[in-house]
Regions:
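Nucleotide-sugar donor-binding/catalytic module of glycosyltransferases
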Residues: 1-211
Length: 213
């Protein structure tokens, strides 16, 4: 069975975090572990993370999302087949990771997968399906014009090896940076218009649905 490491950055996420963790750890047909970096929470986020055997958590200074995710990439164990990014307040469908893997498993070079999302309210009531305008058919144009939905990203070990070679001192968002690295190394892009994430919108979102509208 393939192994996937989920990279999760948290900050004061106690309210919705248990639901997210349960959905991630319930992924079917693939083994998952979670590497979580807490970005200076003052609530019970770290306490919740430590309750799960398959979650490894560490903390540090408040770096904000982009640099926090970069730190996760640099600290991630390279001995997994696949890697995925994760937001702290979403809910994943059980087939999320395996669906992505099936799209890139036969690619023998760095590969990056992204998908649409289901935008939901704080109670998981459906609002709309948000398709990604970034189809990666023209990667440079699409990344610059539409951005990239990092919470849907799944990528292979070959791309992780490339990402670990770079430590940018200035970065706007981690998901765009990952996309640019994949482009720079002539990687493979796959855009899936199916949605496997319930992308929760609420008053305390660190990153909101305007990035996926």
């Amino acid at each position: 069975m393939c192994r996937c490491l989920i990279l999760l950055s948290t900050y004061n996420g106690e309210k919705y975090l248990p639901e997210l963790l349960e959905s991630v750890l319930a992924q079917k047909d693939i083994y998952v572990d979670i590497l979580a970096r807490d970005d200076g929470s003052t609530d019970k986020t770290v306490e919740i993370l430590k309750k799960y055997d398959r979650v490894k958590v560490y903390g540090g200074n408040n770096l904000k999302p982009a640099k926090s995710f970069l730190d996760l990439i640099w600290k991630a164990d390279i001995n997994y087949d696949y890697y995925a990014l994760c937001d702290q307040d979403d809910v994943w469908k059980e087939e999320k990771i395996i669906s992505a893997v099936k799209c890139i498993e036969n690619i023998d070079k760095p590969a990056l997968y992204s998908s649409a999302v289901e935008v939901v309210d704080k109670d998981l009531t459906f609002i709309r399906k948000s398709f990604t305008d970034n189809t990666f058919k023209n990667p440079l144009y699409d990344i610059l014009t539409y951005g990239t939905p990092g919470c849907t990203f799944v990528f292979n070990k070959a791309l992780m090896e490339k990402l670990k070679q770079y430590k940018p001192s200035v970065i706007s968002m981690h998901d765009s940076w990952i996309s640019f690295v994949c482009l720079a190394v002539n990687g493979f892009f796959y855009s899936d218009q199916n949605a496997y994430i319930m992308y929760r919108q609420h008053d305390a979102n660190v990153l909101g649905a305007q990035r996926h509208s």
